[in-house]
Amino acid sequence: MKVGERHYHTIWLNEDGRSVDIIDQRWLPHEFRVVTLKTVADVADAIRDMWVRGAPLIGVTAAYGVAIAMAKDPSDAHLDAVWEELNETRPTAINLRWALNAMREYLRPLPEAERADAAYKRAAEIAEEDVELNRAIGANGLDVIREIASKKKPGEPVRILTHCNAGWLATVDYGTATAPIYMAVEEGIPVHVYVDETRPRNQGAYLTAWEMNGHGVPHTLIVDNAGGHLMQHGDIDMVIVGTDRTTANGDVCNKIGTYLKALAARDNDVPFYVALPSPTIDWTVQDGVKEIPIEERTADEVSFVQGRAADGSIASVRISPEGSPAANPAFDVTPARLITGLITERGIATPSPEGLKALFPERS
């Protein structure tokens, strides 16, 4: 996507052929910074501390982390050690483990002398595959927006609620939940996006709103608790979110608060869609509530908020009393029964084992 007059991916290989650059998302929307990752420790920090975030982008970043590791030490022991180190950074996003497995399975049969170059080649392929998957997701989701738009009066926008950031900043490009929105805008379909702020890290306010601004998409930032009210009053035509892990039966694990949006959507007959590339599907898990590990993040993310101060500096301020404990589960699980459809690169699946296997028969 474009930032100013330049087209960016969220991650790219440097001219030295070894280090990678990323957009450091901790500073958005106030500052646009690019940082270089040169070591596995850099990559682990970037994933764990959310310099990069979003399940697809985490996976691609980890793939490049393996490549960086192979350039230093291509042994089996180092390959396994790096797999373990990076896999522990974010436990919920399945794309992380998928990418690490893809890299290890590709590299293991190769002679050690060939592994470094092969690793960078495979990581670049995973990055490009992500772009193509998201483009296909966008085309399939666009059909849903077109259908809703066809029932509107001329010029009346399709009103879309989204939660967290499943935009191009969460992937290499296009995004998952935002890809259909961007394609609708490019096609001339009027849309208006309601952006949940998404506490506690405010990815909606910081990132999705920044994306919408940059792409010229009409949007309104709302507090997390306003979505149900808007649905009650007929102000939302559809909800579309991303996912960090989707089970074989169609349960969806996404940013905390997604489940409440799905409940409100069901109560108000608002279609609730989830956009995802197939590497986000965990075919080994059936019951998302019981089986998916939920990352617990630091209490400081709840007790403090970051923003731009009056003097222009970026400041973090406490918003809760000293000594008040805070819980910070990063994700929740939305049961398949609350989901209208799963928008994948192969089409829109009904959220069920049968629906997913119809699109992915190789998993039967």
Curated annotation (Swiss-Prot):
The keyword Amino-acid biosynthesis applies. One of its GO terms (molecular function) is S-methyl-5-thioribose-1-phosphate isomerase activity. The record marks C164 as: Transition state stabilizer. The active site is at D244. The keyword Transmembrane does not apply. Substrate binds at R53, G54, A55, R90, Q203, N254, K255. Catalyzes the interconversion of methylthioribose-1-phosphate (MTR-1-P) into methylthioribulose-1-phosphate (MTRu-1-P). Keywords: Amino-acid biosynthesis, Isomerase, Methionine biosynthesis, Plasmid. SUPFAM superfamilies: NagB/RpiA/CoA transferase-like (SSF100950). Pathway: Amino-acid biosynthesis; L-methionine biosynthesis via salvage pathway; L-methionine from S-methyl-5-thio-alpha-D-ribose 1-phosphate: step 1/6. It catalyses: 5-(methylsulfanyl)-alpha-D-ribose 1-phosphate = 5-(methylsulfanyl)-D-ribulose 1-phosphate. Its EC number is 5.3.1.23. Belongs to the eIF-2B alpha/beta/delta subunits family. MtnA subfamily. It is an enzyme of class 5 (isomerase). GO terms for biological process: L-methionine salvage from methylthioadenosine. InterPro entries: IF-2B-related, IF-M1Pi, IF_2B-like_C, Initiation_fac_2B_a/b/d, M1Pi_N, NagB/RpiA_transferase-like. This is Methylthioribose-1-phosphate isomerase. It holds the Pfam family IF-2B. It comes from the Bacteria.
